[in-house]
């Protein structure tokens, strides 16, 4: 798969999707703010820089993820994410 650029939420979330070791992956930047994403496949989000707070659909509490930490989202689900105190960079692996 050739790298593919994606833009969401009026340009506030930018990503580049590619295949790594046979697995679909994307890297990107989330501008400060709050956003909701739906999932088809299960995903693992790793915070590369900055901080993301996340809340998976069906849960009550926001969990803080600083750089170097990850969280997983089930397939056919969704999650809220917010970049706090500036933009955040991430790597998303589709499981």
Predicted segments with their positions:
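Transition segment at domain starts
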Residues: 1-20
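Conserved short histidine dyad/triad with adjacent acidic residue
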Residues: 11, 20-40, 72-75
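Short histidine-centered beta-strand/loop micro-motifs
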Residues: 27-29, 35-39, 56, 62-64, ...
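Short hydrophobic/aromatic-rich beta-strand segments that constitute the beta-sheet cores
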Residues: 37, 54, 90-92
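Short, conserved beta-strand element in jelly-roll/cupin
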Residues: 40-54
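Short acidic-glycine-tyrosine-enriched beta hairpin
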Residues: 59-76
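Ligand-binding loop in jelly-roll beta-barrel domains
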Residues: 74-95
């Amino acid at each position: 798969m050739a790298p593919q650029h994606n833009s969401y939420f009026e340009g506030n979330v930018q990503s580049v999707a590619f295949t790594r070791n046979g697995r679909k992956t994307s890297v990107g930047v989330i501008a400060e703010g709050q956003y909701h994403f739906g999932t088809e496949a299960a995903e693992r989000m790793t915070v590369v820089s900055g901080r993301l707070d996340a809340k998976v659909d069906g849960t009550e509490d926001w969990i803080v993820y600083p750089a170097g930490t990850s969280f997983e989202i089930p397939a056919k689900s969704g999650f809220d994410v917010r970049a706090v105190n500036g933009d955040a960079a991430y790597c998303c692996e589709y499981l």
